[in-house]
Amino acid sequence: MNFNEILYGVAYYDEYMPYDRIETDFKMIRDAGMNVIRIAESTWSTWEPEEGVFDFTHLHRMLDCAAKYELKVIVGTPTYAIPSWLAKKYPDILAVTHNGKELYGHRQNMDITNPDYLHHAQIIIEKLMEQVKDYDCVIGFQLDNETKPYDTCSKYAQAKFVEYLKNEFPDIDEFNREFGLDYWSNRVNDWDDFPDVRGTINQSLAAEFCKFQRSLVTKFLSWQADIVCEYKRDDQFITQNFDFDWTTHSIGYQSQ
């Protein structure tokens, strides 16, 4: 892949905007000297309004208009904000964290280790890729959005954590010794008795769980990349916009 210009652009969401704005907006984007837009990552419920029913009208409007105004496009996989029907049918998809069970309504409230979530995420990614793969204006793909482990502490995540520890410490006595778990009777004598890690007072074990949670993000994004790679062209890239503490760097928040 070769770019002979700096990519400079903006995120655009036709599904949020007054529908008659798209021609005006894309002309303004081009005339402002921008050359790329990012689309699609925030509206799973628009692309799949009910289970198994897909509507990519807004997607094709944006891609066709981008081609008309010679704008490049980065397409995001729409997996960081789940539709309401998914949360209702599979309530276990809503993450369990140190603060308890998530409620539906905000983004990034799902458990990225949940099998039902992963099953439906794969379906929407594949459907999206089928829609965009033949557009020349699509130059790359963003996996998910601002991905983090979201403090996932579900039964699925904790079971994976126990397997991770068993691989790291085949001898359970060594595990207890390394983490100092004899203190306050925290010793684990059988892996099947491993307690809910959210209750631990052992900061070494808590830190190990945080480390493990971050590894879940790597696996999640690698899993998405494998799906996207089945569809993308050789001249298209894959990227991700990792989140960071951006609020303190936003206008109006900087220290004077």
Put a short name on every predicted segment.
Residues M17, T46-E50, T113, Y150-T152:
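A generic structural signal for short coil/turn motifs at secondary-structure boundaries
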